[in-house]
Swiss-Prot record:
Belongs to the AIR carboxylase family. Class I subfamily. Pathway: Purine metabolism; IMP biosynthesis via de novo pathway; 5-amino-1-(5-phospho-D-ribosyl)imidazole-4-carboxylate from 5-amino-1-(5-phospho-D-ribosyl)imidazole (N5-CAIR route): step 2/2. The keyword Isomerase applies. NCBIfam families: purE. One of its GO terms (molecular function) is 5-(carboxyamino)imidazole ribonucleotide mutase activity. Transmembrane segments: none annotated. The gene is purE. InterPro entries: PurE_ClassI, PurE_dom, PurE_prokaryotes. The keyword Isomerase applies. It catalyses: 5-carboxyamino-1-(5-phospho-D-ribosyl)imidazole + H(+) = 5-amino-1-(5-phospho-D-ribosyl)imidazole-4-carboxylate. This is N5-carboxyaminoimidazole ribonucleotide mutase.
Length: 162
């Protein structure tokens, strides 16, 4: 059985952000595989992964990166699969450097760029789910239920309780 979504990141420290994508996919019943694939420290691993991702059965790639953040763009350059980039918040510039690196792709190499940090990781998983749900009615129903539960979790009035 193939795995639908690949979650790749440049280093172990990126997992602090990227596990939110994994948690969201898991909550929706979507199969995923998380890997460390650094554009700078393991370039051969990146090339092998990106060029082989479709053959492995992946349908979507979520790529998280901080700092120079070349991973999403380099992966997108080597695969026909949709790539969603998540800027990981960095200490130096709070992830703004990563955001600009990921979002400024040249025409012809698209990367769907999300928000910095946790929100971006969750939304990348939700976008991946939406893509997969186009061809999976059961997943579409689970995604609708997830959104309904999110809506129902929002209070109508503010509270002093924590």
């Amino acid at each position: 059985m193939s795995v639908d979504v690949a979650i790749i990141m440049g280093s172990q420290s990126d997992w602090e952000t990227m596990h939110h994508a994994a948690d969201t996919l898991e909550a929706l019943g979507i199969s995923f595989d998380a890997r460390i694939v650094s554009a700078h420290r393991t370039p051969d691993r990146l090339v092998a992964f990106a060029k082989g991702a479709k053959a492995e059965g992946f349908k979507v790639i979520i790529a998280g990166a901080g700092g120079a953040a070349h991973l999403p763009g380099m992966a997108a350059a080597m695969t026909p699969l949709p790539v969603f980039g998540v800027p990981v918040q960095s200490k130096a510039l709070s992830g703004q450097d990563s955001l600009l690196s990921i979002v400024q792709m040249p025409a012809g190499i698209p990367v769907g760029t999300l928000a910095i940090g946790r929100a971006g990781a969750v939304n990348a998983a939700l976008l991946a789910a939406a893509v997969l749900a186009l061809y999976d009615e059961a997943l579409a129903a689970r995604l609708d239920e997830w959104r309904k539960a999110q809506t129902e979790s929002v209070a109508e009035r503010p509270s002093n309780e924590a």
